[in-house]
Amino acid sequence: MRKKISIIGAGFVGSTTAHWLAAKELGDIVLLDIVEGIPQGKALDLYEASPIEDFDVRVIGTNDYADTANSDVIVVTSGAPRKPGMSREDLIKVNADITRDCISKAAPLSPNAVIIMVNNPLDAMTYLAAEVSGFPKERVMGQAGVLDAARYRTFIAMEAGVSVEDVQAMLMGGHGDEMVPLPRFSTISGIPVSHFIAPDRLAQIIERTRKGGGEIVNLLKTGSAYYAPAAATAQMVEAVLKDKKRVVPVAAYLTGQYGLHDMYFGVPVVLGAGGVEKIIELPLNEEEMALLNASAKAVRATLDTLKSL
């Protein structure tokens, strides 16, 4: 039986995720959007690349949630970007309405699926998706940490002048300014990153990582990143469908780990067929724990805003 992946939202991130997934031959792909013609056109275009790129998966575009039934993985990328003059609360409300609508329609049709959220504000939207779906918390997660860690690894490799393949890096916390990169748990082929990069330069790399999404928005002027976010999402889908037991940072539901309760928050996990199969608790020092708590406070504030709407 072939695996089935449904992607809700056929914008740049959604359609590029479909591209990465097709190239990896992870399963048949359903690309869904509310705008007629967009998912159908993008899906057909991608499907027509299959004889050239030699991937043997079916790709369909649709506006009908019935086509997503019995999915193994549901990826939600749909959401509104923040517009000029829009308050943080306005953005939360708009995207909460979108998330509620998507999940309430998709989840009942695929009761055994793993849900991966890719819309913002991520931790709050993932919490909402878990609530609306009623799924076990380990089968609902958010993608941010894999992307943030990839940016962190890229900048470390650039600075050290080494292959990015040899850079391992860990970070935690919320997405964006609230993220907590962990240099103490970052290595180049097992060698501490501090052996290659001076503390002041590493501090600059950490700051650039925190602002990574904004840097691309400022360069593009009219959009945001999509290649790397889509690749990060595809890596998570692959870990689930192939039961790879990957150790990656994702937004997972916490029940006391790191002293945090009843919230989705970026932590290292073991990711496999069951979704978040284990949450890894790192022995953080006082400084790292202070940064983590500050991040958690910001994420909690967003969650409180969501709950008050």
UniProtKB/Swiss-Prot annotation:
Active-site residues, as the UniProt record annotates them: H175
Enzyme Commission no: 1.1.1.37
Residue sites binding substrate per the record: R82, R88, N120, R151
Gene Ontology biological process terms in this record: lactate metabolic process; tricarboxylic acid cycle
Enzyme class, UniProt record, top EC level: oxidoreductase
Coiled coil: none
GO MF term list: L-lactate dehydrogenase activity; L-malate dehydrogenase (NAD+) activity
InterPro entries in the cross-refs: L-lactate/malate_DH (IPR001557), Lactate/malate_DH_C (IPR022383), Lactate/malate_DH_N (IPR001236), Lactate_DH/Glyco_Ohase_4_C (IPR015955), Malate_DH_type3 (IPR011275), NAD(P)-bd_dom_sf (IPR036291)
Disulphides: none
Name of the protein in its database record: Malate dehydrogenase
Source species of the chain: Chloroflexus aggregans (strain MD-66 / DSM 9485)
